[in-house]
Amino acid sequence: MIHRSIARLTLACGVLASAFAANLAHADACPAHYVDGRKPEISNPKLDVATQELCYKVFGVMHSGITRTPLWSAEHLTADKLDAAQDLSRENSFHAERKLPAAQRAELADYARSGFDRGHMAPNGDMPDRQSQRDSFTLANMVPQDARNNRYVWAGIEGAVRKMAKKEGDLYVITGPAFIGGNLRKVGRVIVPSHLYKAVYSPRQRAGAAYFIENVDTKQYEMLSIAQLEDRIGIDLLPSLTRQQKLRMLSLPKINSKSKK
């Protein structure tokens, strides 16, 4: 169940959405980041308002003007890209996304003194060059994330997926927030997700699975099939696959939660 605050914002954002209609529909604008070139499909109508797809060189985002976060960030990870990323030092460049309408985007002030990290969905550590790294620091790719969650168990999940991608040769990865339950918070104008997920699909094994974790200081996480995850979040992440294919579980590595960014 999506929090009532999202529903209350839907009407206002719908008016804004019509004003920016030319910018809000970019069907399959960044197919290279998606399995079979097909982007996820939103099945929960409360989420499918004031959305805008943003395409960057190595990842794509579906942004919500209601939550002022991504609904997902999608990547096609390859061993070559990750080898390049490994040699790139981190340079922080957090910034608001000027491609989005001002009323629908997060600003740095929304996160200031909130106690939450600005949590990457497509991680900085996956970025193979400076421009892609800077792109990853857009707030359109961020959610308010529990600081210890972000720096420990989530960092462990990101690192495990990178290692797996190098071993497999390539993986498709979709990362995003989930807004579940009736007690969602806001920081500034940005809605804090209740959970986070990272879905992984291996073309070689023709199987997928996902990490699913509450957005709190925790070491606990679930491993779900893609079908199970889709049922929870209201998004068809891999629309080119059948439900039976989505039930086939990819073996994901267990996480060392001692990791720190």
Summary of predicted features, one role per range:
Residues 4-12:
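Sec-dependent signal peptide recognition
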Residues 2-3, 16-261:
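Domain-level detector for secreted/extracellular nuclease and nuclease-toxin modules, and
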